[in-house]
Amino acid sequence: AFDLQGKRKWSSNIGPFISAHGFSSNPVLYRDLVIVNGDHDGDAYIAALDRATGKLRWKTPRENKTRSYGTPIIRTIDGREQMILCGSKSIASYDPATGKRHWIIDGPTEQFVASMVYNGQYLFATGGFPERHILAIRPNGRGNVTETHIAWRERRGASYVPSPVVLGDYFLIVSDAGIASCFDAAKGTRHWMERLGGGHSASAITANGLAYFVSDRGITTIIRPGKEFEVVAKNDLKESSSSSPAISQGQLFIRGHKHLFCIGK
């Protein structure tokens, strides 16, 4: 951990990590904790460190011991704090304060990269390797809910790396190959499936009721969610990009392979 002047405040070794890509998920802040996803090809774990000191506060083993790279999300659902994580041959929810598991869904594949999204009704997961799946999950269960809490599932158009988005009644996703889909978020009915062009590594983002998809070629496709496929705009950075865009104070930031771009008025 570093302060804003770049001075290191603490460092912590929470255990071994065997993976081709190292720690690729983002740490997550929760109250006075820093939570780290330690899914790897060994004694996998999720761990929480004291934000001020770096001391270990809790560490929960992950029994499947399989590499994954998803960043957990934390939401309050039905009055219960949940930290939900795709990875290590499962989708599971934990109490972020203690690391105790609320519920788990087995599979549906081995490795995950994309983070989940939540729309107040369902959690949406997409992955992974070696098989691709999209799941909509009712997040109010306890124990193993594999057979009871999957609202709908789809395999065509699932992504491995890019995270999806939800806008109103619509769930939008782009596959790694650049094929975008729009679903009815509640029912799982696909409204359309269209090729955007080029591979996609960046996660989708939303702003002003629109969805933004940045391709590996650096082309941003802006789509209005709906039952019909509608491209609002298409912008070419003339530079490749593999990073997810970010929005701050009305401006869009995209990191290309050579430049950082700021787009706005």
Model feature map: region roles:
Residues 1-265:
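Noncatalytic, solvent-exposed loop/strand surfaces
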